[in-house]
Each structure stands twice: as C-alpha cells, then as structure tokens.
Amino acid sequence: RELKGRVIVADPTTDLALVKIEGDDFPAMPIGDSDKLKVGEWVLAVGNPFNLGSTVTAGIVSAKARGLGANGVESFIQTDAAINQGNSGGALVNVKGELVGINSVLSSPTGAYAGYGFAIPTSIMTKVVADLKQYGTVQRALLGIKGASLGSSIMEDQSPIDKSGTTLRDKAKEFGVVDGVWVREIVDNGSAAGADIKVDDVIVGLD
C-alpha cells in the first residue's frame, strides 16, 4: 500500500528525519545493536536503486567506525553489499532481520557501485531520533578548537605548518611532549574558549 508522509523535523548533517504517516497497523522492523556487529558478519542492504523497488543485496561488514568526512558522520559501517543511487535511506539488516544501519553513501570514482558502501549505524540513528523528538534538533558536542595531533610519527614529519617553515616536529620539540593535541586556533564562543584554553596549549588528557 502507498501512504503519504509528512516530514516533522530533519537533521541535515546525517540526512535523517522524523516522518509522520497517517494510518495504523504498521509492521515495525526490530532495531538491533550496531555496536555488536563484527567485521565479516553478513548483512543485507534494502533499497530502491535505479527505481528497482524493494531490492535486497547481500554482503559482509567490511569495517566499523569508518570515517569519510561525509555527512558529518565519522563512524560509518562499511559493507560490500551493493549500495547504489536510490539505496540511501534504506535498511541495513543483520541475519536476524534486525535493523543495524541506514544506507547512506557509496564510495566510487565513477558514481557506480565499486564494492564500497556505507551505512549510518543504529547507535547514531537512535541518538539522532531521540534528540529530534525531544529538542527538535540534534544535540552535538563541540570542543571548539582547530588542532594538530602530536605523536611519535610526527618526529619524522618535515612538512612546514606556517610561512616561517616551522614543522610539527619543531613544535613537538618546543613543547617537550610526544603525545597530545596542539591547539592551533580557538573557535569563538566554543567550549574551549569558555574553558580558558589558549592557542599553543597542548592537550595531553581528558577528565
């Protein structure tokens, strides 16, 4: 059957929304715990690729907590189940029939499926939905700094970070630390500014 839906509120960062549908007796897919997924576990991707309705493809979980810099999500489920144009918003389901992710993006130089698909895990989805219901927007933490990682690997890094030719290795030696985050910029009205963190501070731990 076909029913009309009305968007109540949406989160543009994750491209998720609350949609109200008038009707009753709707079957509901059980929501699984995406945190319990294991790499190599079988999953099914359901969607509408190329207007081929209710298409199901199968694959495995290729990786977890994959960061792409896309959609503001840094914890995608990566799968080789075919995800193409039109799959976005469809279900990623485990072998128990539980929803474990929302199909989101594919990674391909041509725009067609190349073996790399990504889904937003239910651990993020449930948080987004709860916040949209309660606040009408998603509550996100913002540290309020722009920084650079200081670690053992940068001791070999000779890339200049400013016009004077200073490198991260130079900075690490200057600070006398081998692990931490060097604060390069403070965002106005952010949490860091309110906590009196300054440019050139080095964050070495969190309470």
Please provide the spans of the model-predicted regions.
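Conserved "HGTGT" condensation-loop signature of ketosynthase/thiolase-family condensing enzymes
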Residues: 203
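Serine-dependent protease modules
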Residues: 1-179, 184-189, 195, 206
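Conserved catalytic motifs of ABC-family nucleotide-binding domains
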Residues: 200
